[in-house]
Amino acid sequence: MKMSNKKVRSSGSKGIAFKIILLVLSSVLFWLSNPNIIFEDGIGWLAFLNYLPLLFLIKKSRFSETVIFGAVYGVLSYALYGYWLNTFHPLGLIIVCIGYLIICSLLFTVLKWADVISSRNSWLLQFLIICGYEYLKTLGFFGINYGVSAYTQWKNIYLIQICSLGGIFALNYIVIFPSAFLFSLISKKNERNRLLNHVDNARKSSISAYVKKEKALSDTSLKLTFICGALWLALFTASYIYGISVMGKSNSSRFVTIAAIQNNESPWKNGIEEYSRNVNKLIQLTEEAQSLSNEIDFVVWPETAVAPSIIYNYDYGTDMRRFLLISQLLNFIDENNAVFVIGNSHETELKNAGRTRYNSALVFESGKNVHPPEPGIYSKIKLVPFTENFPWKHTFPYLYMKLLNGDNHMWEQGDEYTVFDYRGLKFSTPICFEDTFTTICRRMVLNGSRCFINLSNDSWSKSKACQKQHLAMAVFRSVENGVPSVRSTASGVTCVINPNGKIIKAAPEFCEAYVIGRVPVIEDGYQTLYTRTGDIAGTLAAGLSALILIIQTIVVIIIKTRK
């Protein structure tokens, strides 16, 4: 009896250890497949296996265990992936980890429930659930696109062209499916061998053994698995062929030349001396770029490159040093032939409301809107949760003060998807991580934009992995909508991206630099299929998986009730 108990305990310990190995392996695959501290570009092909150990973990775990494993997976995966958040504020990383602790606990629970109610081909339902989860996690106030599987393929230039048809979440089907396919193949083969061995070892009549063997073969049939695998292979091949066929095709015969400036400045430095030094550095880098080319049509400065509000300090400011700095800047712009796109902390003053501050892009053109400053303005719409926007500041005032991190207030939210039209180029200016959101950039293109000029500041992260993660997502906005992108960042990554998502030119990280590139002027009438239809692939995965779950649950309840 004692020996039996020891064997049970030993078996249980081995089982837990194996589950922990599967859990850690899942998190490590997720981490390594994305840009990370070891591999700056990520190991993209690992993403095709990301969910394989996770599905085995779900299969081998009890319901109570899945909740715990899901929580640990969420914390471990996003702590490894987003470690750079700690540089901004430790609270930022803690909030993300807590968020994914809850989200992944729910995900694992739903995946386990799918395994229970759909035992024969639960892998297909689980595949849809995972695709739906990766779409749903990008929505709402807490929604972020960081960690979506398909973004790992950002260097796979031919494969990602399929996004012009179905978007990032269509590519997600292709990337996630191999994990589900291999899980089905391995688990069904193992289960078949187990059942057949059990039948052979049991003392049954030949007829009974035959019936049981047939049932075992039926329950573990791989027919559907191979059919789905063949369909995936056909889709994968077709996507590559499509990608090869569209590469190099151009929808434009006209170009403009854009200089994107990278000033490599820390966002934490404040004070008029620091502001003046930074503006002078930006002017110097601009002059250096223009000395190399007299054909520059646009000059782009990064997010909040000019910290003092240009319009407010010119019209209402009482600080003479700030006024003189703004006047110096405006004089430089007015004497310049290029259109300037400048990141600015834009302030307005409303009656009975005081001053409000926006994270904005201001567009100036010499002789038209410089003196007095009346630039075109776009104010950031999607603010970073908890760091730029916290809607519960009156409910949780202590947490709000901690999140301010030494600042005195957060940004106000913009409300207009502005499209600028200068020198024949219609463009929009998604700010910071706005170019990671499919819906924002698609809305801009539907409004008439034919180029994204992104203003960012990832220098605070002090992490190349963070900057590459951001760049990886920006690449897809060009592919999805068939328009070029220009990114001007304080650091990470300043570059020019063509409509196929190919990075034409890029500046090295963490240094003062600039990139000069020719950008095609896309025709007004041109829209990709994705631009016209949106994230149908993501909505379909979420809706279909929810519908099947509900139907299967009802069927299980009915069957149990009848018994």
Q: What positions do the PLM features span?
A:
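Soluble catalytic regions of membrane-associated enzymes that act on cell-envelope
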Residues: 242-385, 420-423, 429, 433-435
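Active-site catalytic loop in hydrolytic enzyme cores
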Residues: 85-91, 136-168, 354-438
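CN hydrolase (nitrilase-like) catalytic-core segments centered on the catalytic cysteine
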Residues: 127-128, 306, 318-340, 395, ...
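C-terminal luminal/periplasmic domains and tails of membrane-associated envelope-modifying transferases
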Residues: 294-295, 389, 484
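Short, conserved active-site loops that position catalytic residues or coordinate cofactors/metal ions
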Residues: 38-53, 262-263, 295-315, 449, ...
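Membrane-embedded alpha-helical bundles of multi-pass enzymes
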Residues: 2-246, 463, 474, 489, ...
